[in-house]
Amino acid sequence: MMSGYNGDGVSSLPTRTQSPLARGAHPGAVLLSPKRTALGTLGGGAGGSSAQLMSPSQHSLSLNDILDQQAHPSRVDSSSAMSLDASIHQQQHTSGVGMLSPLLQPQASSISVKTAFLDSFGSRPSSAIGLQHGQGQGPDGPQSATGMSLNNSNIMVNFTNDVNQLCTWMSMLTSAQQNTVMDNLLSSLNEEVLQHTKLKLESLTNSGYLSPSLRPIASPIPSRVATLETSTQSASSAQLPGSLMLDSILSDSAAAGAGSTNSNNTNMASHSLAVNSMYRQWSPSPQMNSAQPMFDYLNDITRPRSAEPSRLRNGHTSHHQNGSHHIAMNSGNGAPPNSHSSTGHQVSSQAGGRFSNIKPQRPHSPTSLTKSTSSSSNFSEAQSPAAQPTSPGPSTPNAASNVSSSSNMNPKSLCDPKLLKNIPAWLKSLRLHKYSASLNGKSWQELIDLDDAILEDMGVSALGARRKLLKAFAIVKECKERGLVDESAY
């Protein structure tokens, strides 16, 4: 071998125009490149002449030796240069077309190199192992084509896993962290990739695309720790080594939790420790006490003053007492507004009707409110002292809310001449048509002078119905005194 090399090996070497390297360059310079600088020079700068290099399986250096020499460049000696020259000499005596190394193929060099860098943190990449195994069959056998197809599929699978892992990791970052990643990522992209990204952003902006809202980082999914604990051994072949590095950012104790799989108790303890560590790192500590309900922590938070029910009730009570023309003070008996209410009515008004008392004041104008206030005052003064304690009249807040909630309790509808002449229709407008038989024999002039005791004697047994009728009678009576009732109603 050495004699053949000394005899005609020099004459068979490629000239300077054919050589992929400069004349002054060391023959083993390609092996001294720590990354893909020399590989890119061979794959892109040499052009067609780079296609003459043989695969690593045909010379004495294996992929392990290449990786070892990249990690320790000082160990390169003259034997590596001689082996490279011998491989170039052997290439001239072959059939002319050899199987290229996958690391030097133009269409797969970038993918394989990037995948090797992503997967080489914990162990050797499965793609590189598959490449060596597939190329060991020889350049002429039919098994080499099958090996190449399997290698290409492995490269694409690993590349897809890398992309999915990177996208998943990016989605779990905050906006500031994503900006930092993009600043470092854009500086390493080619110009054509940047142009493509620019066009993509412009098209998305013109189409009205809105970026999806990021979920809060304060609550990482606790089940991810359990997944790492239980499926590390079963999914180690399908899961990339880089995924553990990306997931380890979530918790410092993920590795410790993944290794404790001796018993169920150990798994549960490590799982709870990992969850506590995650919540301690990303968000405030949650309520982990099972004896305390999850919603009890709301009592410790300072509530805004606008949401205090007690303040709202007190403010509404003061509004009724001070702002509504002192309706309750004009009753003359000094009884509290809710003295007639039972215990159940008070509970329901506090629980269900907490905010309903504010609504009745909206549909009424100040004029109608003044009229109703004055009419209720006049009516309360006309009542007898004996009837007032049992039935205080419609001057209470609950009665006023029930009356004003109806759209028909206004002077215009109550003083309609057509309705005043037809008492059943007038009662139907108040939704009290069930008492038409009891009040049908009287005119509206007689009805407005009735009091609570007379209505009860006439058959109006419901207290709410009597209050509603007395309120309507007071409004019609006030309109009559002011001359607002049409003459056709008489």
Curated annotation (Swiss-Prot):
Q: What are the disulphide bonds in this sequence?
A: none
Database matches in Gene3D superfamilies: Transcription Factor, Ets-1
Top-level lineage group: Eukaryota
Among its keywords, does the record have Transmembrane? no
One Pfam family hit: SAM_2
Where is the sequence biased in composition, kind Basic residues? 313-323
Instruction: Tell me what this protein is called.
Output: RNA-binding protein VTS1
Organism, scientific name? Eremothecium gossypii (strain ATCC 10895 / CBS 109.51 / FGSC 9923 / NRRL Y-1056) (Yeast)
Upper taxonomic lineage: Eukaryota, Fungi, Dikarya, Ascomycota, Saccharomycotina
